[in-house]
Amino acid sequence: MPERLPEFYTAVYRLVSRVPKGKVVTYGQVAALLGVPRAPRGVGTALRNLPRPLSKKVPWQRVINASGGISFRGDVIRVEEQRWLLEDEGIEFSRHGKVDLKKYRWVGPKRWKTPKWKTQL
Protein backbone atom coordinates (compact mmCIF):
# COMPACT_ATOMS: atom_id res chain seq x y z
CA MET A 1 0.00 0.00 0.00
CA PRO A 2 1.38 3.44 -0.87
CA GLU A 3 2.23 5.67 2.05
CA ARG A 4 0.16 8.52 0.68
CA LEU A 5 -3.44 7.94 -0.30
CA PRO A 6 -4.86 9.45 -3.49
CA GLU A 7 -6.54 12.78 -2.72
CA PHE A 8 -9.90 11.50 -3.98
CA TYR A 9 -9.75 8.59 -1.54
CA THR A 10 -8.92 10.96 1.30
CA ALA A 11 -11.88 13.19 0.37
CA VAL A 12 -14.18 10.13 0.33
CA TYR A 13 -12.93 9.01 3.75
CA ARG A 14 -13.38 12.49 5.23
CA LEU A 15 -16.94 12.79 3.96
CA VAL A 16 -17.97 9.26 4.93
CA SER A 17 -16.55 9.81 8.42
CA ARG A 18 -19.17 12.56 8.88
CA VAL A 19 -22.15 10.25 8.27
CA PRO A 20 -23.83 9.92 11.66
CA LYS A 21 -24.57 6.64 13.36
CA GLY A 22 -27.98 5.32 12.30
CA LYS A 23 -27.85 7.00 8.88
CA VAL A 24 -26.70 5.87 5.44
CA VAL A 25 -25.53 7.55 2.28
CA THR A 26 -25.31 6.21 -1.28
CA TYR A 27 -22.20 5.91 -3.42
CA GLY A 28 -23.71 8.40 -5.86
CA GLN A 29 -24.55 10.82 -3.11
CA VAL A 30 -20.96 10.81 -1.85
CA ALA A 31 -19.71 11.39 -5.40
CA ALA A 32 -22.15 14.28 -5.90
CA LEU A 33 -21.20 15.90 -2.59
CA LEU A 34 -17.56 15.70 -3.66
CA GLY A 35 -18.40 17.49 -6.90
CA VAL A 36 -17.97 14.46 -9.17
CA PRO A 37 -21.51 13.11 -9.64
CA ARG A 38 -20.41 10.58 -12.25
CA ALA A 39 -17.97 8.85 -9.93
CA PRO A 40 -19.99 6.54 -7.66
CA ARG A 41 -17.80 3.61 -8.71
CA GLY A 42 -14.77 5.62 -7.70
CA VAL A 43 -16.32 6.00 -4.26
CA GLY A 44 -16.76 2.23 -4.13
CA THR A 45 -13.15 1.71 -5.17
CA ALA A 46 -11.94 4.12 -2.48
CA LEU A 47 -13.91 2.27 0.19
CA ARG A 48 -12.79 -1.12 -1.08
CA ASN A 49 -9.20 0.11 -0.71
CA LEU A 50 -9.74 1.59 2.75
CA PRO A 51 -6.58 0.83 4.73
CA ARG A 52 -7.24 -1.51 7.65
CA PRO A 53 -6.08 1.02 10.30
CA LEU A 54 -8.65 3.55 9.01
CA SER A 55 -11.56 1.11 8.99
CA LYS A 56 -12.24 1.87 12.67
CA LYS A 57 -12.44 5.62 11.96
CA VAL A 58 -14.28 5.60 8.63
CA PRO A 59 -17.78 4.07 8.89
CA TRP A 60 -17.61 2.37 5.47
CA GLN A 61 -20.69 0.29 6.32
CA ARG A 62 -22.89 3.39 6.07
CA VAL A 63 -22.41 3.64 2.29
CA ILE A 64 -24.94 1.61 0.31
CA ASN A 65 -26.24 1.51 -3.25
CA ALA A 66 -28.93 3.77 -4.72
CA SER A 67 -31.65 1.14 -4.32
CA GLY A 68 -30.98 0.88 -0.58
CA GLY A 69 -29.11 -2.40 -0.79
CA ILE A 70 -25.67 -3.59 0.11
CA SER A 71 -23.48 -3.93 -2.97
CA PHE A 72 -22.03 -7.39 -3.37
CA ARG A 73 -18.25 -7.21 -3.68
CA GLY A 74 -17.62 -10.90 -4.20
CA ASP A 75 -17.23 -11.44 -0.47
CA VAL A 76 -20.35 -12.76 1.29
CA ILE A 77 -18.72 -12.33 4.69
CA ARG A 78 -18.21 -8.58 4.09
CA VAL A 79 -21.85 -8.22 2.99
CA GLU A 80 -23.03 -9.95 6.16
CA GLU A 81 -20.65 -7.84 8.25
CA GLN A 82 -21.96 -4.63 6.69
CA ARG A 83 -25.57 -5.61 7.35
CA TRP A 84 -24.77 -6.62 10.93
CA LEU A 85 -22.96 -3.32 11.59
CA LEU A 86 -25.89 -1.32 10.19
CA GLU A 87 -28.45 -3.31 12.17
CA ASP A 88 -26.33 -2.74 15.27
CA GLU A 89 -26.76 1.01 14.64
CA GLY A 90 -30.55 0.58 14.53
CA ILE A 91 -30.97 0.54 10.76
CA GLU A 92 -33.69 -1.84 9.65
CA PHE A 93 -33.77 -3.88 6.45
CA SER A 94 -36.86 -4.90 4.52
CA ARG A 95 -37.50 -8.57 3.87
CA HIS A 96 -35.87 -7.93 0.47
CA GLY A 97 -32.66 -6.75 2.11
CA LYS A 98 -33.18 -3.03 1.44
CA VAL A 99 -32.80 0.00 3.67
CA ASP A 100 -35.58 2.61 3.53
CA LEU A 101 -33.67 5.60 2.19
CA LYS A 102 -36.53 7.97 3.02
CA LYS A 103 -36.09 7.05 6.66
CA TYR A 104 -32.34 6.51 7.01
CA ARG A 105 -30.66 8.64 4.32
CA TRP A 106 -28.26 11.29 5.53
CA VAL A 107 -28.76 14.43 3.47
CA GLY A 108 -25.18 15.57 3.85
CA PRO A 109 -23.33 18.24 5.75
CA LYS A 110 -24.79 21.73 5.99
CA ARG A 111 -21.51 23.14 4.78
CA TRP A 112 -18.99 21.22 2.76
CA LYS A 113 -15.79 22.70 1.46
CA THR A 114 -14.89 21.62 -2.06
CA PRO A 115 -11.82 19.38 -1.83
CA LYS A 116 -8.58 21.04 -2.94
CA TRP A 117 -8.02 18.48 -5.71
CA LYS A 118 -11.41 19.38 -7.23
CA THR A 119 -10.59 23.09 -7.48
CA GLN A 120 -7.44 22.26 -9.41
CA LEU A 121 -9.19 20.36 -12.23
What are these regions (language model features)?
Residues 1-121:
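Nucleic acid-binding interface residues in structured DNA/RNA-binding domains
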